[in-house]
């Protein structure tokens, strides 16, 4: 029985899921908006929101924790120099999920996941 087990399996084993969400979190931090399936977007929130909360207080220990979860120095630098200060006054809710229809091949529900308070000068990338 799977009573009270949280998180989606997404038809992947645990190491694949961990690597996928690490890569997706890095992409979201780098581009600030990505397009993915709705279940993956909802699950990605659980990875990205704690990373941004971690980035609100800049310390060596927090930078190492963020690096352990993303494995990308460029992403860690952006988290602590841009995103941490940007969301310093916000107590959670750093991401927004916008549904955008269904994928052509298999009718999977698709969604954009983006960081709120995103600068408007960037063009939206798909």
UniProtKB/Swiss-Prot annotation:
- Oxidoreductase as a keyword of this entry, yes or no, is no
Question: What are the alphabetically sorted keywords of the record?
Answer: Ribonucleoprotein, Ribosomal protein
Biological processes annotated in GO? translation
Q: Which cysteines are joined by disulfide bonds?
A: none
Q: Does the keyword Ribosomal protein apply?
A: yes
Pfam families the record matches: Ribosomal_L17
Molecular function per GO: structural constituent of ribosome
InterPro entries, alphabetically?
Ribosomal_bL17, Ribosomal_bL17_CS, Ribosomal_bL17_sf
Q: Name one GO cellular component term.
A: cytosolic large ribosomal subunit
Family annotation (NCBIfam families): L17 (TIGR00059)
So what family is this one in?
A: Belongs to the bacterial ribosomal protein bL17 family.
What quaternary structure, including any partners, is listed in this protein's UniProt entry?
Answer: Part of the 50S ribosomal subunit. Contacts protein L32.
Q: Which HAMAP family match?
A: Ribosomal_bL17 (MF_01368)
Q: What is this protein called?
A: Large ribosomal subunit protein bL17
Its taxonomic path starts at: Bacteria, Pseudomonadati, Pseudomonadota, Gammaproteobacteria, Vibrionales
Provide the gene name from the record. rplQ
């Amino acid at each position: 029985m799977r009573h009270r087990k949280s998180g989606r399996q997404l038809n992947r084993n645990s190491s694949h899921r961990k690597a996928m969400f690490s890569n997706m979190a890095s992409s979201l931090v780098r581009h600030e908006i990505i397009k993915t399936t709705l279940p993956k977007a909802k699950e990605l929130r659980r990875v990205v929101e704690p990373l941004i909360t971690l980035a609100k207080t800049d310390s060596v220990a927090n930078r190492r924790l963020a690096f352990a979860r993303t494995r990308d120095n460029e992403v860690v630098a952006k988290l602590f120099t841009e995103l941490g200060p940007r969301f310093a006054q916000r107590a959670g809710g750093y991401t927004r999920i916008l549904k955008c229809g269904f994928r052509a091949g298999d009718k999977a529900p698709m969604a954009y996941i983006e960081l709120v308070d995103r600068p408007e000068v960037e063009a939206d990338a798909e």
